């Protein structure tokens, strides 16, 4: 069992139940999935760029990646309907907790000029999204083999009903929020 999953079931869930004043353990917010998305607009001109992005995301997530395709043609961006323009991966269960552990303990502290995560990055329903400007903050990515720096989006979906519940959940996992 993943370290954070064990921590959640044994310590965090009972503590959150008491802190949030919930009657049942099943009401306690929990993380359901983590989605990592990498938009690669340059893939329109060069297919090798998308291959490198997919390989980076496979190393970061540890599982197979889905290539996302454009839904409609946009002349201004020079893309057509169905062209590959990015990649994403959805992590659940143990892989999700292992990724979250690496994100909190290793990747976030390696961000340059990091002063804490803004607590305003919640969507109003307890889900949290953050953008990472460089994929090299993850230890799985070898800096010498990177063709170019790419950003990625990390979306943490929770069962929390409000932003306060979601913030309490992520704070319990030692997320480095500002203030």
UniProtKB/Swiss-Prot annotation:
GO cellular component terms attached to this protein's record: ribonucleoprotein complex; ribosome
Molecular-function GO term, any one: rRNA binding
InterPro entries: Ribosomal_uL5, Ribosomal_uL5_bac-type, Ribosomal_uL5_C, Ribosomal_uL5_CS, Ribosomal_uL5_dom_sf, Ribosomal_uL5_N
Keyword rRNA-binding: yes
Keyword Ribosomal protein in annotation: yes
Residue ranges crossing the lipid bilayer per the database entry: none
Example GO biological process: translation
Key words, A-Z: Ribonucleoprotein, Ribosomal protein, RNA-binding, rRNA-binding, tRNA-binding
Family under the similarity heading: Belongs to the universal ribosomal protein uL5 family.
General function of this protein: This is one of the proteins that bind and probably mediate the attachment of the 5S RNA into the large ribosomal subunit, where it forms part of the central protuberance. In the 70S ribosome it contacts protein S13 of the 30S subunit (bridge B1b), connecting the 2 subunits; this bridge is implicated in subunit movement. Contacts the P site tRNA; the 5S rRNA and some of its associated proteins might help stabilize positioning of ribosome-bound tRNAs.
Assembly behavior: Part of the 50S ribosomal subunit; part of the 5S rRNA/L5/L18/L25 subcomplex. Contacts the 5S rRNA and the P site tRNA. Forms a bridge to the 30S subunit in the 70S ribosome.
Protein name: Large ribosomal subunit protein uL5
Phylogenetic lineage: Bacteria, Pseudomonadati, Pseudomonadota, Gammaproteobacteria, Cellvibrionales
